[in-house]
Amino acid sequence: MRVLALLLAVKAACVLLVSSLTGTGAVNNSGRWWGIVNVASSGNLLTNSKNVQLVLDPSLALLSRRQRKLIRQNPGILHAIAAGLHTAIKECKWQFRNRRWNCPTTHSPNVFGKIVNRGCRETAFVFAITSAGVTHAVARSCSEGAIESCTCDYRRRGPGGPDWHWGGCSDNVEFGRMFGREFVDSSERGRDLRYLTNLHNNEAGRMTVASEMQQECKCHGMSGSCTVRTCWMRLPSFRLVGDYLKDRFDGASRVVYANKGSNRASHRADPRHLEPENPAHKLPSSRDLVYFEKSPNFCSYNGKTGTHGTSGRTCNSSSPALDGCELLCCGRGYKTRMEQVTERCHCTFHWCCHVSCLNCTSTQTVHQCL
């Protein structure tokens, strides 16, 4: 009976999935597709006879009709999207680990909380890093053969220089950009300033990945000589992408709506429709981040804005920077406690092949914001 009940539950879930993939009940809110990161877990994935992934969860209705169609047309791509989101969230948390806003996330469909309903710098970074994460993961999955509809980027072939030529398997960043633009941008609706800034920041994330592609080469020749080299293009590390976007966050441009219409058909933000709030400032480039409202006060909890505050956060009592107790705790002060920490130490490599370590316990001073 339990087996029969399980089979009926699976069948019902599949019916719900088909209904969500073909129905009209799509949710078009900006960023709702981020909920995939909570849906596309290994426990929710099955594979049919054609090796096509099915997600047994009607939460895919979080996607727009266009997004669901793109997943159906590109078998295997759901894993890449989820992986890209995981990477983007991890990078966001690392980049802002010492800031008052430290990229908090939830298990709700709107992963980043209410901050995405605003138009501040933090919102801009979230849209850029998640867009970059999808492009980066899809491009790599193509070259790894994990997506049926794409392969390596073989456009660069033949001679490349006097002692090297193009070859190998380049990461398919063009497919990653194309799919990212179609998938990510299709969740945006409207023709207002929020629509334009979201699309601009989405594109800034994709452009950063594409612009930081790196050439790698392998030598060929007798006895290890490098008579000729075969070269291909490789994706940058996502840490490099995060570092670049963090720099753009610090120098983000506050913009206003130029009221010249919008390029809705191409699903891209036209830079001509965004102008600096300060006429003396230059127009933002395609890789700059843009925002249109001041960031909320992240010092204290505020349910309306979705800010968690900094109470309980660990701070550095000797640092004058943003991670210092004076700035991170917003002048409220901090408490100090002693904590015992156990770490691996005195590690030794043994041939062949394992490493043995001892456990060392030390007492550390921990400062926490009041």
Curated annotation (Swiss-Prot):
Main location: secreted
Post-translational modification: Palmitoleoylation is required for efficient binding to frizzled receptors. Palmitoleoylation is necessary for proper trafficking to cell surface. Depalmitoleoylated by NOTUM, leading to inhibit Wnt signaling pathway.
UniProt-annotated glycosylation sites, renumbered to this chain: 28, 316, 359
Subcellular location: Secreted, Extracellular space, Extracellular matrix; Secreted
Matching InterPro entries: Wnt, Wnt1, Wnt_C, Wnt_CS
Region called Disordered, residue ranges: 261-282
Pfam families attached to this UniProt entry: wnt (PF00110)
Phenotypic consequence of gene deletion: Morpholino knockdown results in broadening of hindbrain boundary marker expression.
Basic and acidic residues: bias regions: 267-280
Gene Ontology CC terms, in alphabetical order: extracellular space
Disulfide bridges in this chain: 92-103, 142-150, 152-169, 217-231, 219-226, 299-330, 315-325, 329-369, 345-360, 347-357, 352-353
Signal peptide, first to last residue: 1-19
Key words of the record: Developmental protein, Differentiation, Disulfide bond, Extracellular matrix, Glycoprotein, Lipoprotein, Neurogenesis, Secreted, Signal, Wnt signaling pathway
GO BP term (any one): hindbrain development
Residues with lipid group (O-palmitoleoyl serine): 223
Coiled-coil regions listed in the entry: none
Gene3D superfamilies, per database record: 3.30.2460.20
Gene Ontology MF: a single term: cytokine activity
Recorded family membership: Belongs to the Wnt family.
Role according to the record: Ligand for members of the frizzled family of seven transmembrane receptors. Acts in the canonical Wnt signaling pathway by promoting beta-catenin-dependent transcriptional activation. Involved in neurogenesis. Performs a partially redundant function with wnt10b in the formation of the midbrain-hindbrain boundary (MHB) organizer.
Protein name, entry field: Protein Wnt-1
Organism: Danio rerio
Taxonomic classification: Eukaryota, Metazoa, Chordata, Craniata, Vertebrata
Name of the gene: wnt1
